[in-house]
């Protein structure tokens, strides 16, 4: 089996989730000046009516690395809420973060809400009073470490990176699960990985590997003639198409579709990367009611029940009964993202081994105010 099977999180497992960085003290010395809201009492249908009265439009900046990578989410949202018109502009999280900073500095914010990787940016925006606090329905069911206690932001889905393998090229029993498995001569010329110095999530993976295996691991890995790409989704796509057999810098559903050409599996011994993807509404949002509807829908049971990996709600079961219970520590990833000096040093160190990243931004999105 690729995951543990139990009906719900144990207290011990939940304690692991809350390791390292409680949100209550994460923002810094500046006080949170805005009033902490009560939990939303309106239903999704009532929120829908309010959003339509506001105009029915919504602009979201979403983290990702495939063009129009949230098209399915847009379609599902518009179908669930007739009359709404949502646009989720997908770009690399690091680019969206600085894009939002630039827009705020210019006094013209283009998005109403955002869900991107950089939780350190959300902490800063909260401290600067840039976020509109909101606690959607079901707030009390969201794991405590997946939400800001003041309602400034909350996790809307859980992502994990681990092995993805092509099922026609590698059997599950032979698939590499731990970092050392990727050094097996059988996988020479068959590995695709994301540039770690281009992606903070993958950078964390390599930080963990080097801390456990030493820098000699990089020399051995490079002898495998790895193909390096920009973005985790392009790495997964290369495996799905059969261009390469394996990667460990990608995500995938815990339960693969029957016709899938790839499969996602967790390590046997190593720890693995996981994090709740944070989302927030901006204080200067042009469509705050629509943004509240969107966040409420994302964390609703009807959406969380369809999670590809783990839900953010404790009252929702994971696919196949899998639980978030071993060898993963989201709090450590949060602390890692906040130490920007260490990140920059690690990027430079890895670039000395791998070389400068090559290729364009895979989303094709450019500029401070990109065309939506």
List the model feature ranges, each with a label.
Residues 40, 335-372:
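Conserved C-terminal helix/tail region of periplasmic/extracytoplasmic solute-binding proteins
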Residues 1-25, 34:
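N-terminal secretory signal peptides
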């Amino acid at each position: 089996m690729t995951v543990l099977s139990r009906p719900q999180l144990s207290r011990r497992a939940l304690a692991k989730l809350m390791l390292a960085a409680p949100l209550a003290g994460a923002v810094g010395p500046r006080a949170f000046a805005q009033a902490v809201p009560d939990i939303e009492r309106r239903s999704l249908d009532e929120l829908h009516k309010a959003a339509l009265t506001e105009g029915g439009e919504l602009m979201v900046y979403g983290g990702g690395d495939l063009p129009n990578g949230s098209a399915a989410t847009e379609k599902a949202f518009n179908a669930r809420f007739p009359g709404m018109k949502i646009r989720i502009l997908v770009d690399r999280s690091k680019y969206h973060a600085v894009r939002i900073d630039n827009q705020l500095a210019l006094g013209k914010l283009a998005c109403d809400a955002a869900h991107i990787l950089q939780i350190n940016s959300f902490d800063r925006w909260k401290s600067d009073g840039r976020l509109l606090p909101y606690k959607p329905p079901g707030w009390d069911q969201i794991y405590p470490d997946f939400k800001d206690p003041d309602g400034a932001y909350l996790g809307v889905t859980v992502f994990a990176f681990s092995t993805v393998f092509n099922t026609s090229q590698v059997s599950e029993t032979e698939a590499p699960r731990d970092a050392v498995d990727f050094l097996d001569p059988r996988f020479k010329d068959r590995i695709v990985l994301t540039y770690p110095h281009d992606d903070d999530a993958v950078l964390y993976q390599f930080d963990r590997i080097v801390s456990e295996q030493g820098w000699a691991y990089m020399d051995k890995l490079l002898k495998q003639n790895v193909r390096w790409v920009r973005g985790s989704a392009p790495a997964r796509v290369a495996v799905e198409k059969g261009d390469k057999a394996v990667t460990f810098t990608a995500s995938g559903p815990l339960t693969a579709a029957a016709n899938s050409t790839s499969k996602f599996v967790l390590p046997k011994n190593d720890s693995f990367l996981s994090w709740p993807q944070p989302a927030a509404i901006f204080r200067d949002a042009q469509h705050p009611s629509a943004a509240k509807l969107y966040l409420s829908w994302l964390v609703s049971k009807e959406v969380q029940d369809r999670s590809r990996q783990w839900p953010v709600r404790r009252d929702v079961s994971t696919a196949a009964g899998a639980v978030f219970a071993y060898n993963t520590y989201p709090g450590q990833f949060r602390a890692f993202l906040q130490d920007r000096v260490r990140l920059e040093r690690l990027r430079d160190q890895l670039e000395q081994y791998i070389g400068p990243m090559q290729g364009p931004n895979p989303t094709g999105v450019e500029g401070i105010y990109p065309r939506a």
